[in-house]
UniProtKB/Swiss-Prot annotation:
Belongs to the MinC family. GO terms for biological process: cell morphogenesis; division septum assembly; regulation of cell division; regulation of cell septum assembly. Interacts with MinD and FtsZ. InterPro entries: CAP/MinC_C, MinC, MinC_C_sf, MinC_N, Septum_form_inhib_MinC_C. Pfam families: MinC_C (PF03775), MinC_N (PF05209). PANTHER family: SEPTUM SITE-DETERMINING PROTEIN MINC (PTHR34108:SF1). Gene3D superfamilies: 2.160.20.70, 3.30.160.540. Keywords: Cell cycle, Cell division, Septation. The keyword Nucleotidyltransferase does not apply. This is Probable septum site-determining protein MinC. Disulfide bonds: none annotated. The gene is minC. The keyword S-adenosyl-L-methionine does not apply. Cell division inhibitor that blocks the formation of polar Z ring septums. Rapidly oscillates between the poles of the cell to destabilize FtsZ filaments that have formed before they mature into polar Z rings. Prevents FtsZ polymerization.
């Protein structure tokens, strides 16, 4: 089974980009550009570090990757300790239900779920949740912060579960069975009730509204 070229893990110190040391640099660079473009500014303001396993990366190449992330608004974390020695590039299923006492902050405590969620599967996390895949009907995501679905979102989504009124839900295709933000609930009568394309759901007063996603500049 082939290893993912770039995997992303959220830690207390921000995001860590784990690179496959067996792949060519141009492949890694192009994959990073694709991931940044797909995120559409969602990670802007997040701190990040790059881990190349046990293999040393030439400074010029690493700087090139860092500059790509900078262009998309990420902030390099220059502290080498920012990459935990025991960090892993793939979250275990049990980790998706892990609890944390830390208050969710932009760029911190982001759980990356690098797979689609099927009916009956539930992800619960006190910080932000990023699903790199689809959320199918019958699947559920519960987040204390924002929810980003880099795919089609047709399940049950609960953002700002602890009462965070600023929480948002972003999906490339947003057609949830039920969506709630800080306890405010929305259940569309028809899948086409929400406009197509990448949409952002947020609270406006006591109502959930939907807006076309605009990348931060």
């Amino acid at each position: 089974m082939s290893r993912e070229m770039i995997s992303i893990k959220g830690t207390r110190n921000g995001l860590v980009f784990f690179l496959d040391p067996t792949r060519e640099f141009e492949e890694i660079k192009n994959t990073l550009l694709s991931k940044m473009e797909s995120a559409r500014g969602f990670f802007k303001g997040a701190k990040f570090s790059i881990s190349h396993g046990q293999k040393d990366m030439p400074v010029e190449q690493k700087n090139e990757l860092v500059n790509i992330c900078r262009r998309y608004g990420l902030i390099p974390n220059n502290d080498d300790a920012a990459v935990p020695a025991n960090a892993v590039s793939k979250a275990s299923p049990r980790a998706t239900r892990a609890a944390s006492n830390s208050k969710p902050t932009i760029g911190e405590n982001a759980l990356m779920v690098r797979r689609s969620l099927r009916s009956g599967q539930c992800i619960s996390y006190p910080g932000h949740v990023v699903v790199i895949g689809d959320v199918h009907p019958g699947a559920e995501v519960i987040s204390g912060g924002n929810v980003l679905v880099m795919g089609s979102c047709r399940g049950l989504i609960h953002a700002g579960a602890g009462g965070n009124l600023m929480a948002k839900v972003v999906a490339l295709r947003l057609a949830p069975t039920v969506l709630s933000i800080a306890g405010q609930r929305y259940a569309p009568e028809h899948p086409s009730a929400i406009p197509p394309g990448c949409q952002v759901a947020r609270l406006s007063g006591q109502e959930i509204i939907f807006e076309k996603f605009q990348a931060a500049r």
